[in-house]
Design a protein with these regions (language model features):
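Cyclophilin-like peptidyl-prolyl cis-trans isomerases
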Residues: 2-223
Length: 223
């Protein structure tokens, strides 16, 4: 009898140990799973919104009071840009190139969905036209590369901006730490953001060049 009782007690203890072990394993699995999920979220780099719904509208802020507007007639539709009046070097350079007809017949040579569309290079290569002088970097205290703004492109070196520009398709201010201190915003799209979005969605090759040219037929100063 004693032997039977001992076996029963032993089996009960074994079952308790088994359930205890299962419980511990379950807790460990849950904790590890939670840690992995939180870790992935914490390590994810913030990315621009892929579905922005609005673009900067014409405002009465000082930087756009009585400002110049430029019409880009492209092969995919018209885009109207309003230039900041507190960016005399950058906006002035863009306006001067428009008046000279520099942008007429150029293409958007670099297009990246959910990022930007880039154009303004008379050579169409992205290397730029060496005959066009570079300008000094110019930044305002509220330089933000948000959706719909137009900014000066450069080679990555100081004071290397020339004729190339890009239009932000999404909010790129947080794309990386120095984005807003690298690319000066000198205007914004006030009409035709749908055209910008359509250009941003065209098929491109491995170098982000559209498979079919998207051309700036003409760029003109609006009265």
């Amino acid at each position: 009898m004693a032997s039977n009782k001992n076996r029963k007690v032993s089996r009960k203890k074994s079952r308790k140990k088994l359930w205890l072990a299962i419980g511990v394993i379950a807790i460990v699995v849950i904790v590890i799973g939670a840690y992995q999920v939180l870790g992935q979220s914490a390590n994810q780099t913030p990315s621009p919104s892929a579905t922005p719904t609005s673009s900067p509208s014409s405002s009465t802020d000082n930087e756009y009071t009585n400002s110049t507007k430029v019409l880009l007639q492209t092969s995919m539709g018209n885009i109207t840009i309003e230039l900041r009046n507190d960016m005399p070097i950058t906006a002035g350079n863009f306006k001067s190139l428009v008046q000279k007809g520099t942008y007429n017949g150029t293409i958007f040579h670099r297009v990246i969905a959910n990022f930007m569309i880039q154009g303004g290079d008379p050579t169409g290569t992205g290397y730029g036209d060496p005959s066009i002088p570079t300008i000094k970097d110019e930044f305002t205290s509220d330089n933000h590369n948000v959706r719909g703004t137009i900014a000066m492109a450069n080679t990555g070196q100081p004071n290397s901006g020339s004729s190339q520009f890009f239009i932000n398709v999404v909010d790129n201010s947080n794309r990386y730490a120095s984005f807003d201190t690298s690319y000066p915003v000198f205007g914004k799209v006030v009409s035709g953001m749908d055209v910008v979005d359509n250009i941003a969605s065209v098929a491109t090759d491995a170098n982000d060049r559209p498979l079919q040219n998207v051309t700036i037929i003409s760029a003109t100063i609006l009265p």
